[in-house]
């Protein structure tokens, strides 16, 4: 029971922690377009690599961050709705 309480406490702390802000020079300005599940942000092209974050609209807790050299536009992921990229 004690292990369960510790696990729940650590899980609550991890869920409440704010996401780290990316470096200002890594994010490109983007174009915001309306979508069914919310706005879709399309990153603009840059010479330097930029941070690409993919967040399905229907799953708010899922986020994948990676460095990608070119902008991407993804309208949906297996029917889950639009994603935010930029």
Curated annotation (Swiss-Prot):
One of its GO terms (biological process) is neuropeptide signaling pathway. Its main location: secreted. Keywords: Amidation, Neuropeptide, Secreted, Signal. Residues 17-50, 63-75 form a propeptide. Residues 1-16 form the signal peptide. One of its GO terms (cellular component) is extracellular region. The keyword Secreted applies. The modification Isoleucine amide is found at residue 85. It is found in: Secreted. It comes from the Eukaryota. The keyword Signal applies. This is Neuropeptide-like 3.
